[in-house]
């Protein structure tokens, strides 16, 4: 049996707080789908433009040759959007590094880093856990002397 040639694909993830987005990027026609539906239908609209930032920064011509399928889980609306945009940017950089050329990958990376570092680098901040003796992580219960 003849084996089929391997599809040119990369898989990258983005994280923000508890939200995780995994992007599967392969050669295609420029389609971007988020949880099975086109990215153009994402609600709320204000956050949709945040997702489109990598596309708007780099131009549609760089996304024309690739299809992206994104799975986003966890977190709230905003943190999920930040995870999605990070995974899109990281997937495109990885695809260009692996299947196109190093020069165009470097150009893409420079454009993204100049605009916003969080497009490629994860934010390590996490929620601090609650301790005893108070209602939250740092706040203490009120103390009475009389």
UniProtKB/Swiss-Prot annotation:
GO terms for molecular function: structural constituent of ribosome. InterPro entries: Ribosomal_Su5_D2-typ_SF, Ribosomal_uS9, Ribsml_uS5_D2-typ_fold_subgr. One of its GO terms (cellular component) is cytosolic ribosome. The keyword Ribosomal protein applies. One of its GO terms (biological process) is translation. The keyword Ribonucleoprotein applies. It holds the Pfam family Ribosomal_S9. Keywords: Ribonucleoprotein, Ribosomal protein. Belongs to the universal ribosomal protein uS9 family. This is Small ribosomal subunit protein uS9y.
């Amino acid at each position: 049996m003849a084996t089929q040639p391997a599809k040119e694909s990369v898989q990258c993830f983005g994280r923000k707080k508890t939200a995780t987005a995994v992007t599967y990027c392969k050669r295609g026609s420029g389609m971007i789908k988020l949880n099975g539906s086109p990215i153009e239908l994402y609600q709320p609209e204000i956050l949709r433009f945040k997702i489109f930032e990598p596309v708007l920064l780099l131009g549609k011509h760089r996304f024309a040759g690739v299809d992206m399928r994104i799975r986003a889980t966890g977190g709230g609306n905003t943190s999920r959007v930040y995870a999605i945009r990070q995974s899109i940017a990281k997937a495109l950089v990885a695809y260009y590094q692996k299947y196109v050329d190093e020069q165009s990958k470097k150009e893409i990376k420079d454009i993204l880093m100049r605009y916003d570092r969080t497009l490629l680098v994860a934010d390590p901040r996490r929620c601090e856990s609650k301790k005893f003796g108070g209602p939250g992580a740092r706040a203490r219960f009120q103390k009475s002397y009389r």
